[in-house]
């Protein structure tokens, strides 16, 4: 049986996180399954560059997307219907992580290092981490990955090798999570891309209060299968 959310944690209270840089809460520790799950249950996530110590964050405000509020433009709706994409779930988790971590034009390095891939691979094996994948003609062309606890989904990263391929994955995820009774998708930090799809910032205090409810709802362990 899953242990209930409590105030006991490896981490200091999120209210003590720095204002500048926004949300930096702690440095150090490890990427064990126990510590990662504890972090997520308290609204904390790891984010650090290679060769840096592990850094743990809880920014204020927090970017969230209620699944029922996913925004689908007319052009994206057309892509969902007619682009010839195939959706798969939890079939290529490590491949999705590696694609998300691949160097991108205009970006220096990547925070999705080999230790991160190994750590989240263990979460996947334990049924907590998930990949939502967009395929075309047997090729992985986009997708995202994240962590689910109770009825809370924490989005981590997404990638596209074709236009809108990651958006298609996010829309399908949001629609399925709504059917399953998930309350929020955590988007961590504000970006124009996520805002265009309905995500919005909320105060950290509101986020952690809602989080405390959602992580204690019945857990759906992976691998997942979406409704057709």
Curated annotation (Swiss-Prot):
<keyword id="KW-0808">Transferase</keyword>
<dbReference type="InterPro" id="IPR042203">
    <property type="entry name" value="Leu/Phe-tRNA_Trfase_C"/>
</dbReference>
<comment type="function">
    <text>Functions in the N-end rule pathway of protein degradation where it conjugates Leu, Phe and, less efficiently, Met from aminoacyl-tRNAs to the N-termini of proteins containing an N-terminal arginine or lysine.</text>
</comment>
<comment type="similarity">
    <text>Belongs to the L/F-transferase family.</text>
</comment>
<dbReference type="InterPro" id="IPR004616">
    <property type="entry name" value="Leu/Phe-tRNA_Trfase"/>
</dbReference>
<dbReference type="InterPro" id="IPR042221">
    <property type="entry name" value="Leu/Phe-tRNA_Trfase_N"/>
</dbReference>
<keyword id="KW-0012">Acyltransferase</keyword>
<dbReference type="GO" id="GO:0005737">
    <property type="term" value="C:cytoplasm"/>
</dbReference>
<dbReference type="InterPro" id="IPR016181">
    <property type="entry name" value="Acyl_CoA_acyltransferase"/>
</dbReference>
<dbReference type="GO" id="GO:0008914">
    <property type="term" value="F:leucyl-tRNA--protein transferase activity"/>
</dbReference>
<keyword id="KW-0963">Cytoplasm</keyword>
<dbReference type="GO" id="GO:0030163">
    <property type="term" value="P:protein catabolic process"/>
</dbReference>
<dbReference type="Pfam" id="PF03588">
    <property type="entry name" value="Leu_Phe_trans"/>
</dbReference>
<protein>
    <recommendedName>
        <fullName>Leucyl/phenylalanyl-tRNA--protein transferase</fullName>
        <ecNumber>2.3.2.6</ecNumber>
    </recommendedName>
</protein>
